[in-house]
């Protein structure tokens, strides 16, 4: 009986279909507003809610808090060491997924502070304070051991005896931010290490520009704008000493003079003093460190500083260039001006943060760039998996003078470079959403400017 009913239904449907189709009006330019058809976006489109952004930050926090334990153990007995007066060469950090003293974690500490301020949730701030306090409590006993034995080992050895800007710059900036945010721990010895290394030990060109001796002698790394300059500017804010601001502006302008392409509006990754020509590979994350430097220096640079307008002009030129290379998915490419290179998450997050911050501080045109920020954040959010890991991040990268080097850099969820930028971006997007209104106007995202 059921089979007969199904057959009858099928026959009736077959006869009814032409009549139904004939009764429907055809979809064409006359009968339908085609411009209102829903596009098939590869990335969520539109301004997210504060709640949606907060959920992404929550996943990242929950993951990182679980996989970055803040304690010191004996590497042989695996027992926790609580009395730091009894430290010896066997003391190491309890193993986690990420290093507590890397430059990437300096960015993460700053990102946690920003997320705490934006969301009002103390747990983010506590994350940074707990770990920075641990580093600070290790500093004095470690220095005492090093004085007695220069070959002594310590989990914070490279922080107190840096070999490169990577070892101290981003961490130093985070230490100052934490202190300015109310941290009670004595970070003085850590800041002294930063002052000494950046101020007198890091290699420089003849005009004082921060440089490295690799991969070629006297090489400028765009990364070093961030590894050295924001820390110096933060020390200026902390101490009130103008010399730190003067040096920060000097570094920005001297890096930019050599490495910024004004026609493209973006920076090359490396510049070698001894080369007759300077190959331009516009690596995305290095450009991220540069634009982040510009924003972070402006945040603390006195309004009356004579170099402020030049830094502001450089920021606007760079943001304009970066915006022109954003992919339709919301991401930016590994090599900015080579759209056949892969889409990269950490750089996209840094741009989302830097542009949102620049809008919130009034440095750039809010209506012109806010939609790009929304698209960028929506793209980044798709790369935070259910566990809270950030996908699509390029691993640590040196410097190359051929395209294959950049095209084929691996990506990995354990590339630590993605986490701080995602926290910073989410925090600043929340701040933007709290102060600005967005609408869909004729299908496109627009910031509402009318009163």
Task: Report the location of each language-model feature.
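Boundary at the C-terminal end of the N-terminal hydrophobic targeting segment
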Residues: 21-23
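Bacterial N-terminal signal peptides that target proteins for export
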Residues: 1-9
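Extended ligand-binding clefts on enzyme/binding-domain cores
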Residues: 189, 219-334, 341-352, 364-402, ...
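Bacterial N-terminal signal peptides
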Residues: 9-19
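CBM-like carbohydrate-recognition segments
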Residues: 25-103, 118, 122-125, 130, ...
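Extended ligand-binding groove/face enriched in aromatic
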Residues: 125-129, 136-271, 278-280, 387
